[in-house]
From Swiss-Prot:
InterPro entries: DNA_mismatch_repair_MutS_C (IPR000432), DNA_mismatch_repair_MutS_core (IPR007696), DNA_mismatch_repair_MutS_sf (IPR036187), MSSS (IPR046893), MutS (IPR045076), MutS2 (IPR005747), P-loop_NTPase (IPR027417), Smr_dom (IPR002625). It is an enzyme of class 3 (hydrolase). Homodimer. Binds to stalled ribosomes, contacting rRNA. PROSITE patterns: DNA_MISMATCH_REPAIR_2, SMR. Belongs to the DNA mismatch repair MutS family. MutS2 subfamily. It comes from Shouchella clausii (strain KSM-K16). This is Endonuclease MutS2. ATP binds at G335, P336, N337, T338, G339, G340, K341, T342. Its EC number is 3.1.-.-, 3.6.4.-. Keywords: ATP-binding, DNA-binding, Endonuclease, Hydrolase, Nuclease, Nucleotide-binding, RNA-binding, rRNA-binding. SMART domains: MUTSac, MUTSd, SMR. SUPFAM superfamilies: DNA repair protein MutS, domain III, P-loop containing nucleoside triphosphate hydrolases, SMR domain-like. The gene is mutS2.
Amino acid sequence: MERVQRVLEYNKMKQQLLEHVASSLGRQKVNELVPSTSLEEVRHLQDETAEAANVLRLKGHVPLGGISDVRPHIKRAAIGGVLSATELIEIASTLYGGKRVKQFIETIIEDGHIEVPILAGHVEQIEPLSPIEKAIKQCIDDNGYVLDSASTSLRTVRHQIRSYESGIKSKLDQLTRSSNTRKMLSDAIVTIRSDRYVLPVKQEYRGTFGGIVHDQSSSGATLFIEPAAIVTLNNQLTEAKAKEKREIERILRELSAKVAEESEQLLLNVDKLAQLDFICAKAYYAKAVKAVKPTLNDRGYLDLRQARHPLLPPDKVVPSDMAIGDQVRSLVITGPNTGGKTVTLKTIGLLTLMAQSGLFVPAAEETELAVFEHIFADIGDEQSIEQSLSTFSSHMKNIVSILNEMNENSLILFDELGAGTDPTEGAALAISILDHVYKRGALAVATTHYSELKGYAYNREGALNASVEFDVETLRPTYRLLVGVPGRSNAFAISRRLGLDERIIDQAKLQIDSDASQVEKMIASLEDSQKSAQSEWSRAEAVRREAEALKRDLEKRMASFEEMKEAALQKAEQKAEKVVAAAQENAELIISELRDLQKQGVAVKEHQLIEARKQLEEAAPKLVSKKRKQVKKQAEKAKRLPEPGDEVKVLSFNQKGTVVKKIGDNEYQVQLGIMKMAVPIDDIQLLEQERRQPEKAITTIRGNDAHVKAELDLRGERYEDAMRRVEKYIDDALLAGYHQVSIIHGKGTGALRKGVKQFVANHPRVKSARDGGMNEGGLGNTVIELK
């Protein structure tokens, strides 16, 4: 299988697949990918790809950022090792990524728009382990710095360090400002040697200056001396830093122990994330190459529809249609060299390998492929499709091996069968080999330019001819496969087109016997008939597509009409509601005035006031009642009840609010401004909006908001790791309330800068991005404005 993968360029296809993984976890899975020979397993692999493809169609992406292969860290912690701060934050980031993708899939399951049982099975085994994530993030920031808040002792000792450093700098500043001292210094700066603060003193003042010499310049003209006035403070600072180091080690040891306690579940989480990354990569790749899920069988039947080779440029590849299997067990593709026969052969083989690997195939719907136990290919000398053919002996050695290993559940691909030797003998061998393969029950597709094999399919049961179309006018192959029609050499037509004397061509025709001439004429007639039938089919297909387009357009117009009708009714009702409200306001004013008159002794009967109010109040509830019926109808159509966080409209108040919680079978608590009130379900209208993510999805990182910096330094990072950090950093910056942040990537080769620009350009929460100004780092810094 390894040899046929190389011949059919399976590994090149895997390189394309690698472009769609989100992490090194998915990359490892792709590198391990091999075709399966079990129909049941292949169907499962195809089903998981289909689930991920449906998720992409519904949501557009799967959030897999921030995850990385932390298995070595986990295993080291499990045997008692102490992890570094960077390793621990990578574990926390992977936990966060796992929690996010778990919530993402669970939300899809709750919505019920699509079924994802395989993906659900994977995320079900992922445990968020929030206590570990929270513990790490409370102690370490995203840059791997252990925070002061990690412990009381660390906060205290760092306060001491800052105090000592401040005292040292103050004394050194006094010395550098002193006119007596300044003349002794090579430069009025403070520097550090051997973790001690020192001043650069000229060699000639060594005895005068006093203090401890820690270093000297390469020329010897400058000595780096620790002044006697700060020796004690420097000693205290050194001791404090040693305490800080011990405390950090203690914190890292405790966090590593927490990781060790959950090492088994952590490893399972990572394995499931690797599987999810791989499955989603297959779906992303299918979308990129416009691939479909094939129907599968185990009876050796292939039905390729508009099949395309995935390694060829989409604008140049010509789709092919062909069916082989069941009654037809051998397909012989004839025609001249450079006609595209080898491309067709490789397309059949590679698409079969892709399907057996659980990948969708670049073809049209209803494509069907078989799952074979063995796939063999004798194609050239294992060269790319542009290279020349191998020798006869090389071909024959490979063919002998194939014939010895094949069985009835095998697919065999022969390129230029019988080539490289005497044409008569080569053709005879080719016919005999094809007969042998047919008797063994295997499926064979062979290409040849020998005219002797053109009649093979007409004389053999279970065999079919095919050819690759050649345009005599342009002298170029069209690469279109014509099934049922053997290929022609077109030698006379091509020679005439190139200007060969007609007398020479006529003389050459006399050298061909009448039977051969009749065969060529028959082939030409078949080819013309095939083209005519194909043309008619294309016209019929165009009419069908036009009819479907008209049907879709009509449905769209009907839907638009219904929306316009509904909008007009709603507008009329709103207008009526305003009229009633205005009338009610005026009536209330009149009733108030009547009461004033009543108090003044004017005869106004109370029952008249009550009746007037009653008539006014009866008008508005009718509108509200009608509105409630509409809302109920819309709710039934939407098939979704309000949920906490949903924005709604309370009809009786005509006010927008937010659902807090459900407090009864048909009653919800709604936040209206500063008020919370109970509202019945038929008084609530769900507003059109993107559904909010539950608050619990972000609460675990609140403790880290205070430590998010206004800039992210990516210098020295690998591209893949850098992109994960950018995605995570933008999420944290938004949660921390930043409106503008900077991402430092350096100038270097420009790869990081380009990657950052491409990422933020597609981020929904990024308003704009620009290069830093002269005082902002220039092209080495990208300044991002957040929405």
